[in-house]
Curated annotation (Swiss-Prot):
Official protein name in the record: Ferrochelatase
UniProt KW keywords: Cytoplasm, Heme biosynthesis, Iron, Lyase, Metal-binding, Porphyrin biosynthesis
Any single GO BP term: heme biosynthetic process
PANTHER family: FERROCHELATASE, FERROCHELATASE, MITOCHONDRIAL
Source organism per UniProt: Escherichia fergusonii (strain ATCC 35469 / DSM 13698 / CCUG 18766 / IAM 14443 / JCM 21226 / LMG 7866 / NBRC 102419 / NCTC 12128 / CDC 0568-73)
Subcellular location as annotated: Cytoplasm
Amino acid sequence: MRQTKTGILLANLGTPDAPTPEAVKRYLKQFLSDRRVVDTSRLLWWPLLRGVILPLRSPRVAKLYASVWMEGGSPLMVYSRQQQQALAQRLPDMPVALGMSYGSPSLESAVDELLAEHVDHIVVLPLYPQYSCSTVGAVWDELARILARKRSIPGISFIRDYADNHDYINALANSVRASFAKHGEPDLLLLSYHGIPQRYADEGDDYPQRCRTTTRELASALGMAPEKVMMTYQSRFGREPWLMPYTDETLKMLGEKGVGHIQVMCPGFAADCLETLEEIAEQNREVFLGAGGKKYEYIPALNAAPEHIEMMASLVAAYR
């Protein structure tokens, strides 16, 4: 019997190809057109998106991307490629492809890349530690659309999330310990997760429960008292209520209350990107210090750290 050949598909959100208004507009149009992301009536949403949001937001967001752009591209792309290459070295018998839900390389190009390697089984690892319909669900939807056009489809193993995975929690804990050793233990460790509309959670998305699971497990691994660890949500968009408490408002409140030293980690981001490097490391630092805080550090994402790659390898190797 022929041995099954397994490939790995690493999936993430995506990024503009360049820090320009035109590239950002293309990216945002694709991203904000996905019903998993914005499920507003198309009759209402299309005119607002095309006539107001894209023209106004694209130039402003392009400037933000330019402030964090790296020699090899956007931070998300640079770190995602590093993850892909490191995982391929760690598992040399399993081809590894990278695909993005929006922008390039697309998920379809990643599937085609693996099929060209004659794999008959694909392990799909969305790099979102905590499941949400707007992230992991979007990967599932696009993968189904891609495979619906194939005459022959490979076996698929789909990793829903890894919010309480032991290796993931340990990697986070070691990163926090290293930051404490470098900067001193703060008054508070703030864990900031990307937000989603509260309505999505009310309708069954268990994302907030998965975030709470990671927070609980990480605090336990660190041996920190509950009052020394706080969980918030960032990056809200639009007018409807999102998961609370909001990161920026919380940091302002903490600064005003006299909390002097805070360190912030974003456990839901497998790779640093605009939302971590600009929003958290820069914008929210200014919010906290401007409200009276004294010391603020951002703890980087795991990116391509060896422990992170080992965690990925252990996750996917179970599905060989």
